[in-house]
Amino acid sequence: MKRLVFISFVALSMTAGSAMAQQGDVKFFGNVSATTCNLTPQISGTVGDTIQLGTVAPSGTGSEIPFALKASSNVGGCASLSTKTADITWSGQLTEKGFANQGGVANDSYVALKTVNGKTQGQEVKASNSTVSFDASKATTEGFKFTAQLKGGQTPGDFQGAAAYAVTYK
């Protein structure tokens, strides 16, 4: 009997694994505004959220790829923005150079993001300057224009990144 209990105990201890649940993070993000004007990314006039940056050599610089955050002209809240400022705050893997590689092998490469028609033209988005301002009236006309440019580091490989933005109208 003792032997049966001992064998049962050994068998149970071998099959009992860790019962610890997986941990994770949840991010909550929102904005409170009296006026809303939803924007959609557009690349070469086509709605989309993937910007193809092309291929660059190590330490090379890619072409500037233009894109805009634009609202449909028939969206109700956008019409009341003509005298306001739109502050766009970017978040993601921001460094002092730009957006860092998040999933590719070219880990010392980055994307330089600059305004085209912001209140400060050519303003770079980086960790110390993640908010850029635009005349809000541009939301339904030309949109809030940017360029994205891949800057190659020393390590060859693929580059993958993502960024989020939030718009506050003042």
From Swiss-Prot:
GO BP: cell adhesion
Keywords, sorted A to Z: Disulfide bond, Fimbrium, Signal
GO cellular component terms, semicolon-separated: pilus
Signal peptide as annotated in the record: 1-21
Domain of life of the organism encoding this protein: Bacteria
InterPro entries per the UniProt record, alphabetical: Adhesion_dom_fimbrial_sf, Adhesion_dom_sf
Location(s), subcellular: Fimbrium
Cystine pairs: 37-78
Membrane spanning residue stretches: none
Described function: Fimbriae (also called pili), polar filaments radiating from the surface of the bacterium to a length of 0.5-1.5 micrometers and numbering 100-300 per cell, enable bacteria to colonize the epithelium of specific host organs.
Family named by the database record: Belongs to the fimbrial protein family.
Protein name in the entry: F107 fimbrial protein
Naturally occurring in which organism (per UniProt): Escherichia coli
Lineage: Bacteria, Pseudomonadati, Pseudomonadota, Gammaproteobacteria, Enterobacterales
